[in-house]
């Protein structure tokens, strides 16, 4: 038995022991998907009846990293190589105006709440390469000679608190920590910020079930849009602890006021401006524990003031009967998202491709990083895809950009794609928080600047 198999056996045994101790003796049936990921993809996904379980199906890809010259597999006409290696759980990317790339190295801040589900979740996350001590810093990467490989790196900011989203507005760099939005003075070309940060506004903290907070500046620089995920799967701990969560907020930079922009979004992650319509788009990870086929994660154009269902309903007005008390008044107002890309695929990074230097077939759509499932059988995600757009809306079937993050038997993961960014040449950068690498995707005839 390999070392990874032993670790998985130990974790599985511990999970079983916790469940038995809590009185759950037949909790998870051998539940498997009954339809393909493709069936749960597109503007009108197939939504079968729920198959509820106390705990989700656990189907872990044990992390093994990349060895030697191993790398993800690019689509035909594309090439991939490592832009930077040896990072420490790189989660998010941000390009500065001079072409420097910021990398948020971050992990969950953890929780002091010791419920059975939380303890099980901690064991599972440890097996998929998450749940360790957070580096709590931002790394700067610089390619000085234009060969497509970062040859300079430095600790740009440290002593943060599970940082994630970043946005430069004028000469101020904003960073979304797990507990607050903070800002720092920025001078172009510097490789480290020594100045102390200033808190711009508090964000929901304490127990952080979904801890990542992302930000996106408005085109005029007056506003930051802030994502805040829910504190549970489906209000498991009551709605009181969900105050200010599962939504996108709008932060007015001049006044410091934070107000809700859209609600009912279980775990919104990346935000992006669609170039033709100017609409705000978001990637959202949906709920668990109602089967391998539900609920599809999605992207959608965000409507101001809209309610997207969580926790009372999903994908519009499909009622989640687990939530008590029910709120039929809110369900009646819930709107369906624009486009699904399969259950439990775990969307994170998105990047519109209008500034890409990849071949023309990849320049009118949206790149999406699917971090990959741990609770679906068979697994889903673990790839970077491209969704074609027409006139500002998804149009057509997604295409793979990068695959090969799983081993051939799908039992192990070389990596898991997370954040995306386009570098100054238009190449696609992909953060890989298991492989501890930032990958760079180009056309086969365009490997450098």
Swiss-Prot record:
SUPFAM superfamilies: Soluble quinoprotein glucose dehydrogenase (SSF50952). Coiled coil: none annotated. Its EC number is 1.1.1.-. Keywords: Cell membrane, Membrane, Oxidoreductase, Transmembrane, Transmembrane helix. The keyword Transmembrane helix applies. It is found in: Cell membrane. It comes from the Bacteria. It is a single-pass membrane protein. The chain crosses the membrane at residues 8-24. Pfam families: DUF7133. One of its GO terms (cellular component) is plasma membrane. Its main location: membrane. One of its GO terms (molecular function) is oxidoreductase activity. It is an enzyme of class 1 (oxidoreductase). Converts L-sorbosone into 2-keto-L-gulonic acid (2KGA). To B.burgdorferi BB024. This is L-sorbosone dehydrogenase.
């Amino acid at each position: 038995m390999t070392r990874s198999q032993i670790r998985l056996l130990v974790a599985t045994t511990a999970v079983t022991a916790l469940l038995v101790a809590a009185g759950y003796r037949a909790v998870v049936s051998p539940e498997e998907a009954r339809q393909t990921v493709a069936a749960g993809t597109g503007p009108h996904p197939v939504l079968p009846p729920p198959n509820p379980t106390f705990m989700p199906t656990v189907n872990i890809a044990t992390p093994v990293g990349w060895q030697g010259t191993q790398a993800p597999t690019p689509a035909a006409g594309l090439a991939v190589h490592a832009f930077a290696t040896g990072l420490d759980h790189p989660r998010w990317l941000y390009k500065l105006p001079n072409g420097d790339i910021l990398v948020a190295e971050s992990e969950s801040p953890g929780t002091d709440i010791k419920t059975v589900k939380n303890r099980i979740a901690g064991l599972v996350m440890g097996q998929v390469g998450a749940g360790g001590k957070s580096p709590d810093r931002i790394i700067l990467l610089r390619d000085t000679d234009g060969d497509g490989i970062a040859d300079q790196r430095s600790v740009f900011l440290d002593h943060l608190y599970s940082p994630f989203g970043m946005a430069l507005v004028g000469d101020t760099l904003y960073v979304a920590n797990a507990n607050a939005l903070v800002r720092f003075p920025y001078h172009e070309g510097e490789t480290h910020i020594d100045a102390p940060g200033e808190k711009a506004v508090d964000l929901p903290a304490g127990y952080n079930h979904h801890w990542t907070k992302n930000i996106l500046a408005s085109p005029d620089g007056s506003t930051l849009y802030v994502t805040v995920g829910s504190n549970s799967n489906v209000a498991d701990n009551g709605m009181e602890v969900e105050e200010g969560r599962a939504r996108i907020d709008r932060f007015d930079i001049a006044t410091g006021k934070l107000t809700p922009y859209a609600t009912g979004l279980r775990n919104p992650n990346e935000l992006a401006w669609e170039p033709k319509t100017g609409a705000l788009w978001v990637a959202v990870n949906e709920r668990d524990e109602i089967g391998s086929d539900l609920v599809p994660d999605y992207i959608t154009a965000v409507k101001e003031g809209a309610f997207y269902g969580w926790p009372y309903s999903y994908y519009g007005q499909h009622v989640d009967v687990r939530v008590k008390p029910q709120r039929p008044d809110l369900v009646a107002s819930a709107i369906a998202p624009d486009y699904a890309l399969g259950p439990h695929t775990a969307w994170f990074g998105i990047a519109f491709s209008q500034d890409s230097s990849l071949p023309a077939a990849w320049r009118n759509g949206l790149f999406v990083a699917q971090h990959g499932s741990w609770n679906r059988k068979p697994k889903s995600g673990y790839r970077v895809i491209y969704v074609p757009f027409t006139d500002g809306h998804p149009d057509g079937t997604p295409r793979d950009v990068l695959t090969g993050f799983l081993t051939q038997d799908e039992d192990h993961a070389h990596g898991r794609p997370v954040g995306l960014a386009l570098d100054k040449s238009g190449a696609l950068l992909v953060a890989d928080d298991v492989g501890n690498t930032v990958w760079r995707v180009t056309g086969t005839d365009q490997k450098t600047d």
